[in-house]
């Protein structure tokens, strides 16, 4: 079921299922609901409680915040609905393996919320493994229901939902209701030197005016941007005598402060402004929002649509005010193009004109997940013969492309590094080194997590940071500035007190892939189109005109390489992140021999600065064209001894498989 945010998908899925369950109660848990976050599960929990008051169908949540006595009640008398995250479900499969049949033998339905979040991700592949493992404990094949507000590739979603199941999939198309859409996009060129007061920064002053006295959600792509925005808004509000209505919501904010932000947003009588990352992109009910603010370009059309869908509830128009920015390029050596502005327009146009959303492509060789499910399966079973282990693991849906030879190589490696141990009977058990990995609660998750430092003041936890600060450092967290007073490196605990001014954040971010189609649309907007889009505000329109004039001057409509002074050239591949990184890798590994390239600096996924030993622009462009058309084998994309470690458990995978997985 796919339909816009707050359009009733949850009720549409649950009401007929609950009717069936009420008519013929299950003898175990009847419905398994899998959601991406504890917050969404808690939100659904309260909504379902109201639906089920008269039906005598209990609703249970199972995650780290649920009291142990509540879990014991479910184990003693399993029935009704169980709401759970993939990580908690993994823990259930491992730690309650002997009770799984009693818990799930009469499981009728599996409901997976926010399907688009899971598809193509490690967590989504983990869910497919979990459902296949659960099937060994159920009397019949449970029916699966997927819910999503943003879905572009129905065929991929149907394949994903049906993986490992013999059931067919229906995907009813819901017509659009003709909901009105309000968009605006403004742009700012920001000086290198930050003004002393946020009120003197036109960017933040504009943001303040757009949110003043309103119920607004500000989305940013990085935690540091949410912190900087709220710190600036609070400073401006204090200077002008306005109340502090500002909150921050992301994964490194303490749960109590996140809940306070959610409550403030739900209050129908008072204004509130919360800056968030993906944590509020999902379907938590925040009540009637007046507007969504997006800082800089979203990474995908799917993210744009998901964030836009947070507004326009209860029949009102959907509204998003986008604000892009760029640093002053003069004298910096950077290409003077407003990439965030151009990417914002490209994403808007791909949705408005084509209703296009990014397709989902699961990994071909998910070796990190293979390690995880091998250890999880063996931990749950206690011991297994190698053939039994191989059968139980390699029959899981994500591992169809994994050969017996590859799996044999993995098992030999795990024996060699003591993650597995072989008994005299030939059976395999978890080894001493492996026990240290699987014995940590972090093992339940297949996504990368950082070992963060918790930050406290004298009364409460504020949140966490990803690197250790020094005493006296200033840091921004929860939209406020703090001075570090004490650091306990062993306990990873930081004590702070409030401080004036603004400061840096202590997080490291990771890059997100942008699709080829977005960059192709960006090029079309820059060098082919003359359209002046109605949603552009004066600053954005003026900057777009300047960018087009510069692109025309550089003849970018017919050239992809332009001189950049001396033996330095600027290359515009006009391709997405994965293709860009592949080209960059080819140039680094083979550009010296074939094109005389001495150095490559990538500004992914927009342009490359290439330094050569000599030659003309035309020669370099011809050489790059020939090089990019050649078919490069996997080994040609890797340095001789390179073993890329990109996923959580890659450090336990033999190098031969890491290389194969990287190029696969």
Residue ranges, per PLM feature:
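Conserved interdomain linker/interface between the two RecA-like ATPase lobes of SF2 helicase motors
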Residues: 132, 143-222
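Conserved strand-helix element at the start of the C-terminal RecA-like helicase core
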Residues: 30-44, 146, 208-236
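Conserved helix/coil segment N-terminal to the catalytic DExD/H
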Residues: 64-108
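Conserved helicase ATPase core of P-loop NTP-dependent helicases/translocases
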Residues: 69-72, 251-277
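Conserved segment of the helicase C-terminal RecA-like domain
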Residues: 269, 302-359
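Conserved helix-turn-beta segment of the N-terminal RecA-like "Helicase ATP-binding" lobe
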Residues: 41-63, 159-166, 237
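C-terminal accessory/connector segments of nucleic-acid motor ATPases
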Residues: 355-481, 486-487, 563-578, 593-602
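Conserved SF1/SF2 helicase motif Ia
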Residues: 19-44, 137-141
């Amino acid at each position: 079921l796919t339909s816009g945010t707050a359009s009733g998908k949850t009720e549409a899925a649950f009401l007929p299922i609950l009717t069936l369950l009420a008519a013929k109660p299950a003898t175990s848990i009847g419905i398994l609901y899998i959601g991406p976050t504890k917050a969404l599960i808690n939100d659904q929990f309260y909504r379902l409680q109201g639906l089920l008051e008269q039906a005598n169908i209990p609703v249970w949540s199972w995650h780290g915040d649920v009291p142990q006595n509540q879990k014991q009640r479910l184990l003693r008398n399993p029935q009704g609905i169980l709401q759970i995250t993939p990580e908690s479900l993994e823990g259930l499969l491992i730690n309650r393996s002997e009770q799984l049949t009693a818990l799930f033998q009469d499981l009728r339905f599996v409901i997976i919320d926010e399907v688009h979040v899971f598809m193509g991700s490690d967590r989504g592949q983990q869910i497919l493994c979990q459902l296949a493992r659960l099937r060994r404990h159920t009397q019949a094949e449970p029916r699966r229901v997927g819910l999503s507000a943003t879905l572009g590739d129905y065929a991929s979603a149907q394949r994903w939902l049906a993986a490992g199941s013999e059931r067919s999939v229906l995907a009813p198309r819901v017509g659009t209701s003709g909901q009105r859409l309000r968009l605006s996009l403004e742009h700012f060129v920001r000086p290198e030197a930050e003004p002393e007061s946020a009120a003197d920064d036109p960017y933040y002053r504009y943001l303040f005016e757009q949110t003043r006295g309103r119920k607004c959600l500000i989305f940013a792509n990085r935690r540091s941007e949410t912190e900087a925005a709220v710190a600036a808004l609070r400073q401006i509000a204090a200077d002008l005598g306005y109340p502090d209505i500002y909150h921050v919501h992301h994964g490194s904010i303490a749960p109590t402060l996140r809940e306070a932000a959610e409550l403030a947003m739900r209050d129908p009588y008072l204004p509130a402004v919360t800056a968030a990352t993906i944590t509020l992109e999902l379907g938590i009910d925040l009540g009637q929002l007046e507007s969504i603010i997006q800082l800089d370009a979203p990474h995908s059309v799917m993210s744009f649509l998901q964030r836009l869908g947070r507004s326009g509830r209860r029949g009102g128009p959907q509204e998003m005010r986008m604000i892009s920015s760029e640093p002053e390029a003069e004298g910096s050596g950077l290409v003077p193009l407003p990439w965030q502005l151009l990417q914002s327009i490209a994403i808007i146009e791909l949705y408005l004109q084509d209703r296009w959303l990014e397709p989902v492509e699961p990994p071909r060789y998910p070796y990190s997940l293979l390690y995880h499910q091998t250890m999880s399966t063996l931990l749950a079973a206690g011991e297994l013969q190698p053939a039994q282990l191989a059968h139980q693991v390699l029959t899981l849906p994500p591992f169809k492309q994994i050969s017996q030879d590859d799996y044999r190589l993995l098992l030999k490696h795990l024996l060699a590094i003591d993650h597995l141990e072989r008994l005299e009977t030939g059976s395999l058990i978890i080894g001493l080194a492996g026990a240290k990995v699987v014995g940590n609660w972090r093992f339940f998750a297949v996504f990368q997590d950082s070992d963060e430092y918790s930050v406290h003041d004298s009364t409460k936890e504020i949140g966490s940071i990803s690197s250790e600060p020094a005493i006296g450092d200033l840091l921004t967290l929860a939209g406020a500035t703090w001075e570090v007073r004490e650091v306990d490196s062993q306990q990873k605990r930081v004590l702070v007190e409030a401080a004036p001014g603004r400061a840096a954040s202590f997080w490291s971010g990771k890059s997100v892939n942008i699709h080829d189609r977005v960059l192709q649309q960006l090029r079309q907007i820059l060098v082919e189109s003359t359209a002046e889009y109605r949603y552009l505000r004066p600053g954005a329109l003026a900057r777009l005109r300047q960018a087009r004039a510069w692109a025309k001057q550089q003849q970018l409509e017919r050239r992809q390489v332009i001189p950049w002074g001396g033996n330095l050239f600027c290359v515009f591949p006009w391709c997405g992140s994965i293709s860009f990184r592949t080209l960059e890798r080819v140039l680094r590994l083979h550009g010296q021999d074939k094109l005389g390239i001495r150095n490559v600096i990538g500004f992914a996924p927009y342009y490359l600065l290439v330094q050569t030993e000599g030659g003309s622009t035309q020669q370099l462009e011809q050489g790059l064209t020939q090089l990019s058309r050649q078919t490069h084998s996997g080994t040609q994309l890797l340095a001789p001894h390179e073993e890329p470690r990109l996923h959580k458990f890659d450090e336990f995978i033999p190098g031969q498989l890491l290389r194969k997985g990287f190029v696969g």
